[in-house]
């Protein structure tokens, strides 16, 4: 299992969206060379993963593991959008649980995540929450330490 890296506590899903789009673009590149074993071997070495993993990713046109999005998800529309980009699920936190309408908002996110491919249900889920009660969150530009900057750099 992996997760995309959004910025938790911000209510800004843009970082999670950016990461899943980057991941999808990289998978498309691998998919485009799926018939060239030498290129797949080169990519496997470059990424420091097994040839079998690169080959399977190319064949599936997705990572061969579950991919969850996290960070900044605070509305049903956020969750549905990430699912439509290819995520297998979403993790929610303070964007939901610190909102004034947390129970209603959590139910709406579950509904939108389950039926992300049905716009009518996603719209109904979005109508279940009052955006005036959304957690305003933090400005990602002013964070001292961003999630994507933690840990050792590779």
Where are these predicted regions, by residue range?
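Generic hydrophobic/packing signal
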Residues: 23, 69, 82, 87, ...
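Contiguous hydrophobic segments
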Residues: 12-21, 61, 68, 72-82, ...
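Generic preference for flexible, low-structure residues
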Residues: 15-18, 29-32, 36, 83-85, ...
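Conserved anion-binding
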Residues: 1-66
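Extended, intrinsically disordered, low-complexity segments
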Residues: 28-47, 113-154
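C-terminal helical cap(s) of enzyme catalytic domains, especially alpha/beta-barrels
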Residues: 11-26, 98-121, 133-137
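Glycine-rich phosphate-binding active-site loops on the catalytic face of alpha/beta enzymes
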Residues: 1-13, 72, 85-106, 154
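Active-site/ligand-binding-proximal alpha/beta "capping" segment
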Residues: 41-96, 148
């Amino acid at each position: 299992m992996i997760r995309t890296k959004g910025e938790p506590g911000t209510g800004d899903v843009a970082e999670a969206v950016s990461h899943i789009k980057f991941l999808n673009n990289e998978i498309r590149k691998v998919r485009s060379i799926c018939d060239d074993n030498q290129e797949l071997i080169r990519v496997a070495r470059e990424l420091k993963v097994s040839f079998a993993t690169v080959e399977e990713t190319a064949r599936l046109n997705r990572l061969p593991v579950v991919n969850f999005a996290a960070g900044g998800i605070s509305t049903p529309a956020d969750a549905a959008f990430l699912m439509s980009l290819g995520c297998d699920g979403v993790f929610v936190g303070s964007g939901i649980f610190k909102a004034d309408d947390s129970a209603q908002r959590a139910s709406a996110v579950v509904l939108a995540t389950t039926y992300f491919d049905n716009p009518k249900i996603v719209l109904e889920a979005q109508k279940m929450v009052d955006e005036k009660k959304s957690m305003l969150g933090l400005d990602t530009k002013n964070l001292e330490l961003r999630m994507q900057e933690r840990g050792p750099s590779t």
